[in-house]
Amino acid sequence: MLVVYAGCSPYQAERVLKVLNRMLKGVFKESPVHTTIRTWLAKAGLDKLTHPYKDMETAYAMIMDASISVGDQQLLVALKVPADYAGHALTHSDTEVVGMKVGKSWTADKVKDFVDNVVSTQGHDPDYAISDNGANLKKAMELLDFRHHRDIGHTFATFVRKVYEKDPEYVNLSGLIGKTKHLALSDMAYLMPCKQRSIARFMNLYPVIDWSKSILDNYHRLNDKERYHFSFIPRNASLINELDENLDCIESIMTICKNEGFSIAAVARGRDLIKRCMMPGAARSRQLAQLLLQYLDKEAGLLFDEHSTHNISSDIIESLFGSLKECMPTCQIAGFTESVLRMPLLSMFSDIEDETDYTPVVKCMMERSSIGNVIDWKKQNLLPNLLVERRKRLA
């Protein structure tokens, strides 16, 4: 729990246990060291990966992503989630990590082979799959002949980029916002926008536009010096208001589809929002609206009577990657290590309110997996650790 739920590193967990042991007057007798904790995590994670705790045999969907990388290594992960909408946006407790493998690159054929191996352990194919718009993943889904939902967040961001990325007004505004970084050491630093990301910029456009809208709405409250430096904001008021309205509409549609499930009813509500909020707007808004409508119609075609409400977001796997990044080695040449085996444990220990007694389960995990099993798994699924090779060569 200290590592998986609280986010402690094995070193930090060792110190926490030592403090607790001292405060509780030696109740633990002897607290484990960080290497022991790391070994326990690897054994438990491997057992969880190979012996799923949840029963999703009847119907499941698969979420895949290979967007996390360290150096020249890419990690491909497959998540198993309920095929039917769970009544809420997916959480870690709804998921099972069913496959992980590291490679230098992931072509469509390699992804297909990976998925074939994963599916063979599950008994039958998923009812549908969800992934981002990576060409390799899309092609792999075609080769596998799976129903394939394009993740709603990534796809909507792609549409926004298609409409605005090369638009002269947007390019000018984005450049002017970027130039405000020279104010970082001035008395106006408190008014600076958040840093614009170079990767997935259009997925993270909301904070920048929210900032622009806030400056615009409060421009009259700025002093003369501040107005001078941010005078480009009212000059671009039309574009800022347009983006703010469009992104609000997009966010509302995504909230419906994520929190209430993707269904014919959700599509109808999304279409209504688009027609009311975006169709009356400027040419760019109408172009974006058409792309959104086409997406909703195409994805609705993948729904079927038996499972009429689908999950359509891969946010949960992005959250999983976020938890992994917190425990990754800081040295890039180390690549991916056995620390990735902590990810399967998150579905068990993600909810502190869960009163389930996992002690017997964890005990079984530790007894069922050995260090030898972990070593074998690393040889099959991870690439050689170049940091170890460096130490050997330069010893």
Region locations from a protein language model:
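Glycine- and acidic
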Residues: M1-V3, R22-K25, T95-M100, L302-E306, ...
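Short, amphipathic alpha-helical "recognition" segments used to contact nucleic acids or chromatin
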Residues: M1-Y11
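Short, solvent-exposed positions on alpha-helices
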Residues: Y11, T35, A334-G335
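DNA-recognition alpha helix
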Residues: Y11-V27
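RNase H-like nuclease fold core
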Residues: K25-A129, A135, K139-H154, K162, ...
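Acidic/histidine-rich catalytic cores and adjacent linkers
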Residues: S131-L143, K179-A395
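RNase H-like two-metal-ion nuclease catalytic core shared by retroviral integrases
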Residues: G153-G178, S314-S319
